[in-house]
Curated annotation (Swiss-Prot):
Topology term for the membrane: Single-pass membrane protein
PTM per Swiss-Prot/TrEMBL: The N-terminus is blocked.
Name of the featured protein: Mitochondrial import receptor subunit TOM20-2
TPR repeats, residue ranges: 42-75, 83-120
Disruption of the gene: reported phenotype: Slightly delayed flowering time. Triple mutants tom20-2-tom20-3-tom20-4 are viable.
Family named by the database record: Belongs to the Tom20 family.
Cytoplasmic side: 1-178
Top-level lineage group: Eukaryota
Keywords tagged on the record: Acetylation, Membrane, Mitochondrion, Mitochondrion outer membrane, Protein transport, Repeat, TPR repeat, Transmembrane, Transmembrane helix, Transport
GO term, biological process aspect, one: protein insertion into mitochondrial outer membrane
Length: 210
């Protein structure tokens, strides 16, 4: 796995955020905003891991975000982050039925996020896009791109915005998405792969938390 300088800086930043959130959790386990930051950092860090570790880290992120929801059930940013985690996880899976289970969960959480914040255009577009995800996953796997990634081991986080051109992105082995969201006081790039980039490239950050 090769990292650019920007990748390495992001890795350090989010690892620092993860450690800070872990320490803060010991002081105040009922801080839902801290749990949101923790889950967001794990979501970002999963991009830099080999596939098996990335899946575990995504599950850990979901766990932290679900815990935030037990404290604040209406926290729509957490719902949206969980949906992105399930989407990323689905693209790490070759079996279409197993992937569909993750996509279905992603759709459920995108819908819940939109229900909590119905004026959020990003949530609405995310929900619309998620309905097309299983078909894109199948195309991705049929074209052999999925086997390249699933058999390749490492994550492919790239610095800055990932290219919207799928073939160019795959050659560079980038799996960033252009989902961007400002939920933790910084911009997080939701992890994913080039197929999801093509679907999500027009999305911008949601409004600040209410």
């Amino acid at each position: 796995m090769e990292f650019s300088t920007a990748d390495f800086e992001r890795l350090i930043m989010f690892e620092h955020a993860r450690k800070n959130s872990e320490a803060q959790y010991k002081n105040d386990p009922l801080d839902s905003e801290n749990l949101l930051k923790w889950g967001g950092a794990l979501l970002e860090l999963s991009q830099f891991q080999p596939i098996p570790e990335a899946k575990l880290m995504l599950n850990d992120a979901i766990s932290k975000l679900e815990e935030a929801l037990t404290i604040n059930p209406g926290k729509h940013q957490a719902l949206w982050c969980i949906a992105n985690a399930y989407t990323a996880h689905a693209f790490y899976v070759h079996d279409p039925e197993e992937a569909k289970e993750h996509f279905d969960k992603a759709t459920e959480y995108f819908q819940r996020a939109e229900n909590e914040d119905p004026g959020n255009d990003t949530y609405r577009k995310s929900l619309d896009s998620s309905l097309k995800a299983p078909e894109l996953h199948m195309q991705f796997m049929n074209q052999g791109m999925g086997q390249q990634i699933l058999g390749g081991g490492g994550g492919g986080g790239g610095g800055g915005m990932a290219s919207s051109n799928v073939s160019q992105s795959s050659k560079k082995k980038k799996r960033n998405t252009e989902f961007t969201y400002d939920v933790c006081g910084w911009i997080i790039l939701a992890c994913g792969i080039v197929a999801w980039v093509g679907m999500a490239k027009s999305l911008g950050p949601p409004p600040p938390a209410r």
